[in-house]
Amino acid sequence: ANTDNFIYGSGSRMSMKNSLSLSEAALAELKANGTPAVVRLKVEPGQAIKINDLIRGEVVFQSDELDDKVLMKADGMPTYHLANIVDDHLMQISHVIRGEEWLSSTAHHVLLYRGFGWEDTMPAFAHLPLIMKPEGNGKLSKRDGAKFGIPVFPLAWPSANPEEYAPGFRENGFLPEALINFLALLGWHPEDDQEIFTMEELIQAFSLEKINKSGARFDYDKAKWFNQKYIQQMDNVSLAKLIRPYAESKNYTSTEDFLVEVAVLMKERVTFVQDFTEVGYYLFEPVRAYDQDTVAKKWKPELKPAFEGLITFIDQQEDFTSAPLEASVKTYIQETGLKAGDILSLLRIAMAGTMKGPAIFDMAAMLGKKETLERITKFVSAQS
């Protein structure tokens, strides 16, 4: 017989060995022998079980298609379905909000509420659409995190096997507020085109009834965009506090004022919190390597005397704040007949090792005269 679609329910229970099909004598004998038994929910036939889902509207289940769920296992332990209902009732849960894969179980849960006489205090149900894979085909899973190199959990998924360890959004440098904002817009959209919300704005605007029924594609680039925006909007003192643990993990000794300056210079250029110390490492330690493509295009041996003169000139500057220093150096470059584009590009490479990053003279002012001169001198020596 084909048992692939077998349902232990109203249509089959009398052909099974249970308390309804056996005689009282047979039941007594089984009990006397200590035969293990489960407790099932008896689903009555011919019922239309209606659920008013806050997202999907009215959903109807036919009881003839439902199985008699096991509520208590043979070892006396309750199953999820029983424990879930009792727990929610005792905790006075008002709303059950969960993924759509649980929708099929809701009919059984409604029957349990009715059976216990708790229908008047039954919570409202809302079944969220699935979060789909980045390519939009199928539900996002832990395996997709490993496949695409993206987080799929809020926090790290621990494992005794290092190969199975999965860092979460927190470990990847996401701000909680950014993640909440991103997730809120998966399947829901406000009445206007606003994307960035404070928590209070989200509370006021969000509505379960306006969530789409269809699944939403997981767009990791969009998640990163939200994180960038939240970092950019955060005040610098708060950012400095977030940067500190990353700086300390790399044994960088930094004052609060210094970390605030790091936040000011880098917040428009980073995606994740750890980028302040990884991408912007050159604000904490000497440059590790120079962008050789730029050096090859811009550096010429005859520039060495010009840079030596520039080093002497910079050393003579008493006002080492950004704007005056920039004006003085650019005037010096112009008066000595040097090519500003080449000199400034090479100065940037000397200071940061890359053409990307904060303004040259902002970095110089932050790092101070001594460190600035050491970096330029080291760079020039490396080209000899």
Segments from the language model and where they lie:
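Conserved S/T- and glycine-rich ATP-binding loop of Class I adenylate-forming
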Residues: 41, 223, 347
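Active-site cores that bind ATP or allylic diphosphates and position pyrophosphate for catalysis
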Residues: 1-144, 151, 165, 190
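Long, amphipathic alpha-helical coiled-coil segments characteristic
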Residues: 294-329
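Catalytic adenosine-cofactor/nucleotide-binding cores of aminoacyl-tRNA synthetases and other
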Residues: 119, 124-290, 352-384
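Short, charged/polar micro-motifs that form catalytic or ligand-binding hotspots
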Residues: 99, 169, 213, 333, ...
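Short alpha-helical basic/polar micro-motif
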Residues: 94, 107, 177, 221, ...
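Helix-rich, typically C-terminal accessory recognition domains appended to large enzymatic cores
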Residues: 321-367, 371, 380
